[in-house]
Structure formats: C-alpha cells, structure tokens
C-alpha cells in the first residue's frame, strides 16, 4: 500500500552538452558575491574552472574561492567556508564538482550563521535550522550521490571520528544544478565505478523494504537495470555520451526523493559505511560495495519475497524449479558478480580498515535496518564477513 505523501522538489535541472550556457541566466537571481567551492585541480584540467570564472566575471560577480574539498568532506572545511561567507556577505554558494563538494556547500549554507556548534546542533541533534540559509547552486562533474537535487549533506567530524548525514528540507536543496555528462569523461575509472555502486546502493536501500507491489519499486527496478546496462558500456568506453548521460540522470533520479516515495526505507548499509569512512576515509561507493553482499546475506531471509523479486526483475534469474531461498541467493550472487566485473572493492582490508577498527566502527554506527533491526553485535558480524 502506498503511504500518503506530498512530493515537491525545487531544484531546476539544466541537462545536456550546452547546459553551462544557462548559468549566466541563473546568476541574475542572486546578489553580487559568489563563493565558488570546488575540490582539487580536476576542474582546471578540463577547462571548466576558466569557463565558470569567465561567466561569473561577465555577470559582474565578486568571486570568493574555497578549494581543496576532499572526498568525505570535513567539518573543518565547512567552518572555513562559513567564515568566508560571513566575512564577505556571500549571496550564492556555487559548488563545482561531485557530491562531496555539493554536500560541503549545503553544510556551509546551513551552518555559516548558526549560533553554537553546527555539527552538534544539526548533524547530531538534528535540530531545525532557524538561522539564515545561503542559497546553493551546482555544476556536477562526478555522479553518484544525487546531491545535485536533494537536501542531503554528509559531513565527517575529524575530532569525533563521526561521519553523519542529514537530509535538510527543501530550502537547502540546490536552487539549480547544471548536468553535462561530458564533464564526467575525465573521472578516473576507480571513482567512476565507485559512483556507479553508490547509485545502485541508493536504489537498493529504498527498494528493500516492505513486500507490496509499490509503483515506486517498479521505478527502482528500471533504474537499476539502466545503471547496470550503461555501466558495462561506460567501463569499456568512458567517453560514450549515451551511457554516461544515462548514468548521470539515473543517479539524480535515484536520490531526488522520488525513488523513496511512499515507502519504508533501510539505509543501514550507508550507516555502516559512514563510520567505515570516518575511520578509513575510503571512497564511499567502494565501501558500500564491500559491505552490501555480507549485509544482504545476513538479512535477506527477513524480506525473502522482495529479494526473490530483485533476483527475477533486476538480474533475470529464472525461478523454474527453484525454491524462494535459492532464487534470492542467486540474485545476490549476480549482484556480487557484477561488483567484481566492474572492479569494485569487496574487502574492507583493501579499503585500509584494520581488524582493530571493526568493533569501533560497529559501536559507533547508527543502528537501524529495514527487514531486521540490527544491534552493534550484528554489525560487527557483518563487518567481519566483509573483512
């Protein structure tokens, strides 16, 4: 049965090869000062930095820069950005990069004018944001997180060894996002396949809940098949525009709240990976890939019918002459085979985790779960199976 819901998403998407030309028009809605936030030098290498700075200058904008945003953005970088916002009375934060850069931009937008410690108030206590929020826009260069069209912001507090996520209300969503698949061509393959599994994990976290024939489940199955098919093409030819554009749009649809409408959701794989990332700083998608198979093997019997459906509808497993348990297991074997086919990581050891870290990760993970509510002991068992 579908839950009651209201659907609203305020982000305006400009998609395609010429989408950057729309930035000039978007800038007219905001004041003079723009905080340009990005990672390292990749946007400079592909010429995107120069294009954006030119558009900003032609629009009469005063540009303040914050560079060096890393994968798994840190609270210290958020504080650095907030200081720039206050000192320069920033009117718009323009994030150019992948999900980490956009997450950091959103974090700066809500915390710049926060009284007290924003991480404690907003990422631990989940207090409502009652201070000024600085608008955010984005130019996407790496796909996976869906941050370009949602209110999510995952931030790592280095001092606390805590990586927490928060989904903020629509006021924090990017006002606009520019998506040109060509900007993803230069992303290294390791990061590309990491992003691909991040997309799949977002979809599976929303899929593995309940056993009804929810319309949203059909949407998720279609998106999963699209990602799988196009990933195989993109891995062989990273410059295949059709494959990269389908992956990019699937990533956005996977986490713009549409794929979770009217459903219970899980997200425990992400909760475990967040703490893995806090201790190892590993690539998010690779951490998800390493955790997913042991996690699903641990809980699939509690949601057997949905795992059977997953096997049949996503992986085309034939049910003929097989028990439900056999079908479900075959679907998980197919998922694991795809993970290996794409060159994704399957061991926590390969991500820099030590045996001594596992209890620390388990005991600091936010407890939850969809089909089975987990304890810290359950999570430790899963982590040991991943190691």
PLM segments and residue spans:
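A glycine/threonine-rich phosphate-anchoring loop and its flanking beta-alpha core
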Residues: 11, 21, 114-212, 309
């Amino acid at each position: 049965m579908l839950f009651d819901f209201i659907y609203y998403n305020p982000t305006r998407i400009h998609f395609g090869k010429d989408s950057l030309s729309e930035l000039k028009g978007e800038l007219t809605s905001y004041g003079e000062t723009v905080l340009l936030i990005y990672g390292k030098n990749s946007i400079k290498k592909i010429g995107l930095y120069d294009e954006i700075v030119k558009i900003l200058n032609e629009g009469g904008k005063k540009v303040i820069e914050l560079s060096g945003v890393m994968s798994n953005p840190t609270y210290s970088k958020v504080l650095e950005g907030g200081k720039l916002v206050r000192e320069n009375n920033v009117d718009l934060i323009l994030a150019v990069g992948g999900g980490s850069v956009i997450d950091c931009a959103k974090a700066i937008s809500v915390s710049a004018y926060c009284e007290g410690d924003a991480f404690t108030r907003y990422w631990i206590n989940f207090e409502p944001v009652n201070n000024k929020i600085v608008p955010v826009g984005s130019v996407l260069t790496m796909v996976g997180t869906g941050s370009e069209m949602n209110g999510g912001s995952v931030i790592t507090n280095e001092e606390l060894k805590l990586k927490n996520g928060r989904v903020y209300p629509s006021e924090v969503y990017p006002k606009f996002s520019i998506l040109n698949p060509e900007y993803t061509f230069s992303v290294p393959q390791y990061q590309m396949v990491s992003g691909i599994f991040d997309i799949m994990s977002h979809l599976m976290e929303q899929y593995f809940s309940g056993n009804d024939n929810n319309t949203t489940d059909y949407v998720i199955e279609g998106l999963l098949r699209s990602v799988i098919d196009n990933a195989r093409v993109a891995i062989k030819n990273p410059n295949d525009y059709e494959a990269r554009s389908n992956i990019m749009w699937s990533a956005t649809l996977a986490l713009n709240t549409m794929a979770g409408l009217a459903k219970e959701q899980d997200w425990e794989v992400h909760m475990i990976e967040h703490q893995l990332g806090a201790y190892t700083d590993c690539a998010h998608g690779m951490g998800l890939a390493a955790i997913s198979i042991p996690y699903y093997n641990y809980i699939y019997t509690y949601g057997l019918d949905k795992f059977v459906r997953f096997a049949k509808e996503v992986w085309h497993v034939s049910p003929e002459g097989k028990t439900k348990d056999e079908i479900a297991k075959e679907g998980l074997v197919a998922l694991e085979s795809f993970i290996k086919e794409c060159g994704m990581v399957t061991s926590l050891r390969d991500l820099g985790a030590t045996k001594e870290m596992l209890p620390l990760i388990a005991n600091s993970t936010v407890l939850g779960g969809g089909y089975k509510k987990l304890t810290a002991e359950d999570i430790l068992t899963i982590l040991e199976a991943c190691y």
